[in-house]
Amino acid sequence: MKKYIVLTILFVLPLVVYLFFASGINHFAKLPVLTNDVYDISKISNTTFINKITILGFFGKNIKDKHGDALNLNQKIYKRFYKFNDFQFVMIQPDGTEELTNQLKNELKKGTNTDLVNWSFVTISDQNILDVFQSLKTDFNLDLNFGTPYVFIIDRDGK
């Protein structure tokens, strides 16, 4: 009799627990909208936030220190979603960082074997970087190199 009780517990209990958790419904929380008026960079570059889901980042002048961050973003987010037509990564860089940006792109291509078709590195003046960042209206600040470890999600409407 004990044998049947033990076998029942070992077989039925895990099955019941599995069915309980499998029947659950995921209700993901919506992200808060920080601002409705993000500065559209199409005024100063060929890239736009409109009709694109954008991951916006500011690596700053010290791009060499951000290679790990770029690799993590590439592996955790970009690789899953880059085939969507309305998805893009936009990294805003200060003037004069073009060579370092190209090194980062080459390292991402070589190290991860990823198609960087939806990565955009936009090089603009320091004042324009401040304008774009301040339009996000966050509690975060840019460092002295005009960079931040945080990235921001901008939806199709530019919010």
Regions found by a protein language model. Give the residues of each.
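Thiol-based oxidoreductase modules, predominantly thioredoxin-like and allied folds used
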Residues: N85-E99, L116-N128
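A short, hydrophobic beta-strand/beta-hairpin element that forms part of a small beta-sheet core
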Residues: T148-K159
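Short, internal strand/loop/helix patches
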Residues: N106-T148
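Extracytoplasmic
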Residues: F84-F87, F146-P149
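Well-ordered, non-membrane alpha-helical segments in soluble/globular domains
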Residues: H67-I77, L100-E107
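Short active-site neighborhood of thiol/selenol oxidoreductases, capturing the structured segment around
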Residues: S45-N74, F87-I92
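Hydrophobic membrane-insertion alpha-helices, especially the h-region
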Residues: K2-S23
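Alpha-helical transmembrane signal-anchor/signal-peptide segments
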Residues: G24-I41
